């Protein structure tokens, strides 16, 4: 059984292109057109983070977690002002496909504790974060709020998993 037990979705606070900082912090990054870019670390690096060589994407929740991020949201201020680089439908769909792939590969069931956004870590897992709100707005889907966005991530991932299993 895999030691990787959850997938956490983020945004990178960038324009629509992946940068080196994102590659150091996430396992998979999705550019504005949906292109997947691998990070510097494989998900397996996060099976045990004691060596310090892993993708550090979520405070006190990196061990056992795979980090996915949309290259987006530079200039975002709050859910009503997502800036000039909001998450696109293409990258959201590609990220959900990537999460579904990793869930299938590692036997991760889709629940609010195993597939979630960074904005849900504190409420769903009880791990204190520092005011993180990624992903709490999805303008392409006209959604605001961590739970609403997390529910869309989970339902999209689940639908993709079901199609994979047909």
Question: What do the predicted segments below correspond to?
Answer:
Residues 9, 68, 117:
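Active-site flanking residues adjacent to catalytic metal/cofactor-binding acidic residues
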Residues 59-72:
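Short coil-to-beta-strand
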Residues 1-4, 71-166:
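Basic/polar, cationic surfaces and motifs that engage anionic cell-wall
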Residues 1-61, 131, 137-139, 151, ...:
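N-terminal catalytic cores of peptidoglycan-degrading enzymes
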Residues 24, 64, 111:
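Residue-level signal for beta-strand positions within conserved beta-sheet cores that form or flank
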């Amino acid at each position: 059984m895999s030691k990787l037990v959850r997938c956490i979705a983020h945004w990178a606070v960038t324009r629509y292109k992946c940068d080196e900082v994102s590659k150091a912090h996430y396992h998979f990054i999705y550019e504005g057109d949906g292109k997947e870019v691998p990070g510097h670390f494989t998900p397996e690096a996060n099976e045990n983070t004691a060596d310090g060589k892993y993708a550090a994407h979520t405070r006190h929740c990196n061990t056992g977690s795979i980090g996915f991020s949309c290259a987006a949201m530079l200039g975002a201020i709050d859910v009503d002002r997502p800036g000039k680089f909001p998450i696109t439908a293409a990258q959201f769909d590609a990220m959900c496909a990537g999460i579904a792939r990793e869930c299938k590969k590692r036997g991760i069931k889709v629940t609010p504790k195993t597939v979630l956004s960074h904005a849900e870590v504190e409420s769903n897992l009880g791990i204190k974060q520092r005011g993180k709100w990624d992903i709490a707005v999805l303008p392409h889907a006209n959604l605001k709020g961590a739970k609403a966005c997390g529910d869309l991530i989970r339902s999209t991932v689940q639908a993709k998993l079901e199609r994979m299993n047909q």
